[in-house]
């Protein structure tokens, strides 16, 4: 794997992820301004992409490591937005909206974990294989 292919895979994935995140913000954030739904959707979709990728890469022998870099480091990394989430959470805290802040924190963190596991489950069901999670 040459460095130029690594850079290209990550860059292409990150560009697509960032454009998708921007589009989600434009399309969804105006729906319910107190809770930026576009940011939440971006983080949840990115977590699902990571779960699917982790599970899929583990079941396909010989798959180029570039796919993992493209999907997780690039696409999911460009799509997810911890910095925007943190800024939005801080804004709610500064306004004294503690309940909304706690709800937003729970939705982002709990939802992301749930969607990552759902992504892994999806591949497990499609492949009729195990999740790879310790029981």
Swiss-Prot record:
Na(+) is not transported, but it plays an essential structural role and its presence is essential for fluoride channel function. Keywords: Cell inner membrane, Cell membrane, Ion channel, Ion transport, Membrane, Metal-binding, Sodium, Transmembrane, Transmembrane helix, Transport. Belongs to the fluoride channel Fluc/FEX (TC 1.A.43) family. GO terms for cellular component: plasma membrane. The chain crosses the membrane at residues 7-27, 37-57, 70-90, 105-125. This is Fluoride-specific ion channel FluC. Na(+) binds at residues 77, 80. It catalyses: fluoride(in) = fluoride(out). GO terms for molecular function: fluoride channel activity; metal ion binding. It is a multi-pass membrane protein. The gene is fluC. Fluoride-specific ion channel. Important for reducing fluoride concentration in the cell, thus reducing its toxicity. One of its GO terms (biological process) is cellular detoxification of fluoride. It comes from Xanthomonas oryzae pv. oryzae (strain MAFF 311018). It is found in: Cell inner membrane.
């Amino acid at each position: 794997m040459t460095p130029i292919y690594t850079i290209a895979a990550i860059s292409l994935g990150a560009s697509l992820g960032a454009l998708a995140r921007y589009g989600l913000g434009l399309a969804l954030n105006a729906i319910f301004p107190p809770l930026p739904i576009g940011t939440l959707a971006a983080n949840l979709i990115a977590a699902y992409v990571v779960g699917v990728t982790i599970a899929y890469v583990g079941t396909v022998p010989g798959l180029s490591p570039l796919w993992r870099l493209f999907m997780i480091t690039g696409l999911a990394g460009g799509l997810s937005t911890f910095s925007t989430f943190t800024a939005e959470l801080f804004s709610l805290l500064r306004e004294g909206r503690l309940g909304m802040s706690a709800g937003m924190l729970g939705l982002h963190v709990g939802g992301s974990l749930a969607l990552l596991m759902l992504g892994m489950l999806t591949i497990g069901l499609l492949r009729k294989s195990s999740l790879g999670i310790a029981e």
